[in-house]
């Protein structure tokens, strides 16, 4: 399986994402610059955290116009796994690949610490390695992680089981309905504010994020014929 880590000007979690895939998961991965126009050779697309284009205007608002986003949309339309973490989630929202928007944290402060999440849906290509209702520890690092959507969108997210992760015990940023991560209706595009790539080794405090990447590989192997 081959992963693409998209790199925008201002990305700063691309190395962590690369490490998670190459060193912890043992899969093939490449950095892909934001001006790339074709992602056909990749099986999964990863949009890392950071401050793309300095987060000017709004987080992710400029990155959505990058050349590579047309290819990301194409990959999503084809059903390939697309994961956006933190700033990557914000970019997916701005690009219309996921519903809703991000606001500043209620505290108006940047928050960087581990948080508890509850797995709300373990029947997705990103969460099959988790148990339903499992509580996991994943770090956050953001100033604009306060997810918001209108009532109709929230109702649809709940009915379709598109809310994949919720903050557990404490909501660190004021996010609506404690939402920490959502998928699109097809279930192949996941956006989440917590950083699973920073939780792939117990030496760093948690390895709970590794299961997310393992789930992606498991899904891909179950849906593709692997030849030697």
Swiss-Prot record:
GO terms for biological process: 'de novo' IMP biosynthetic process. The active site is at 86 (nucleophile), 195, 197. InterPro entries: Class_I_gatase-like, PRibForGlyAmidine_synth_PurQ. SMART domains: GATase_5 (SM01211). It catalyses: N(2)-formyl-N(1)-(5-phospho-beta-D-ribosyl)glycinamide + L-glutamine + ATP + H2O = 2-formamido-N(1)-(5-O-phospho-beta-D-ribosyl)acetamidine + L-glutamate + ADP + phosphate + H(+); L-glutamine + H2O = L-glutamate + NH4(+). One of its GO terms (molecular function) is phosphoribosylformylglycinamidine synthase activity. Keywords: ATP-binding, Cytoplasm, Glutamine amidotransferase, Hydrolase, Ligase, Nucleotide-binding, Purine biosynthesis. It is found in: Cytoplasm. Its EC number is 6.3.5.3, 3.5.1.2. Pathway: Purine metabolism; IMP biosynthesis via de novo pathway; 5-amino-1-(5-phospho-D-ribosyl)imidazole from N(2)-formyl-N(1)-(5-phospho-D-ribosyl)glycinamide: step 1/2. GO terms for cellular component: cytoplasm. It comes from the Bacteria. Residues 3-226 form the Glutamine amidotransferase type-1 domain. Part of the phosphoribosylformylglycinamidine synthase complex involved in the purines biosynthetic pathway. Catalyzes the ATP-dependent conversion of formylglycinamide ribonucleotide (FGAR) and glutamine to yield formylglycinamidine ribonucleotide (FGAM) and glutamate. The FGAM synthase complex is composed of three subunits. PurQ produces an ammonia molecule by converting glutamine to glutamate. PurL transfers the ammonia molecule to FGAR to form FGAM in an ATP-dependent manner. Part of the FGAM synthase complex composed of 1 PurL, 1 PurQ and 2 PurS subunits. This is Phosphoribosylformylglycinamidine synthase subunit PurQ. The lineage of its organism: Bacteria, Bacillati, Bacillota, Bacilli, Bacillales.
């Amino acid at each position: 399986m081959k992963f693409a880590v998209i790199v925008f000007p201002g990305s700063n979690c691309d190395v962590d994402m690369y490490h998670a895939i190459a060193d912890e998961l043992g899969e093939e991965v490449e950095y892909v610059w934001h001006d790339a126009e074709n992602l056909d050779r990749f099986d999964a697309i990863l949009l890392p955290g950071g401050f793309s284009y300095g987060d000017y205007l709004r987080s992710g608002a400029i990155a959505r116009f990058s050349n590579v986003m047309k290819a990301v949309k194409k990959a999503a339309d084809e059903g390939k796994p697309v994961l956006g973490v933190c700033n990557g989630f914000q970019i997916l929202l701005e690009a219309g690949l996921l519903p809703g928007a991000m606001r500043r944290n209620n505290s108006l402060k940047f928050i960087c610490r581990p948080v508890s999440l509850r797995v709300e849906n373990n029947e997705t290509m990103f969460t099959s390695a988790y148990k339903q209702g499992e509580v996991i520890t994943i770090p956050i690092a953001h100033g604009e992680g306060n997810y918001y959507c209108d009532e109709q969108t929230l109702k649809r997210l709940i009915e379709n089981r598109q809310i994949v992760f919720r903050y557990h015990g404490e909501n660190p940023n004021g996010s609506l309905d404690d939402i920490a991560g959502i998928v699109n209706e097809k279930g192949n595009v996941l956006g989440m504010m917590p950083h699973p790539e920073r939780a792939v080794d117990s030496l760093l405090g948690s390895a709970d994020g590794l299961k997310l990447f393992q789930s992606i590989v498991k899904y891909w192997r179950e849906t593709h014929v692997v030849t030697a």
